Amino acid sequence: MSESRLHHLACGTPDVERLARFYSSVLGLPEVARHFEADGSLRSIWLDLGAGIFMIEKSGLEPSLVSGVGFFLLALRVSPEERTAFEGRLGAAGAEIESRSEWTSYARDPDGNRIALSHYPKAAPAGPAAAKPG
């Protein structure tokens, strides 16, 4: 039996173009596809996450801000040098860094979704043993 891997993350927004532009221009995620409704209106833009796809989908719901840890957080793996550069790019785009840890910087995208830039040096645990507490 094969192990499951990330296929995609999906995020709803009332403004697909704006959110995709932020993730492409500020965080460097390349666009890989656009999908349209039968009437020709934009339904989604897909961005490359490297190990999967980030699907930015049209939603009729207005974004709701989650304070602290919430339902949505997109954390990107970066080098320490990239973290510093991305912090500058986020600030220039109006997405101020809300908090920092030794390894990770946290900000919000234009819809208020939490994003993180992390260079945690340890590999993520793998396999069934990783799920066991203690």
Predicted regions and their residues:
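Conserved beta-strand in the GNAT
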Residues: 55-57, 115-116
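Core segments of cupin and vicinal oxygen chelate
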Residues: 11-53
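N-terminal beta-strand motif that seeds the catalytic metal site of vicinal oxygen chelate
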Residues: 1-18, 71-74, 78, 123-134
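Vicinal oxygen chelate
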Residues: 14-17, 69, 73-114, 121-122
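A short beta-turn/loop motif at secondary-structure boundaries
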Residues: 37-40, 64, 109
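Short, charged/polar surface micro-motifs in flexible loops or helix N-caps
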Residues: 50-54, 61, 80-84
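Residue-level structural signal for beta-strand termini and adjacent loop
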Residues: 37, 59-60, 118-121
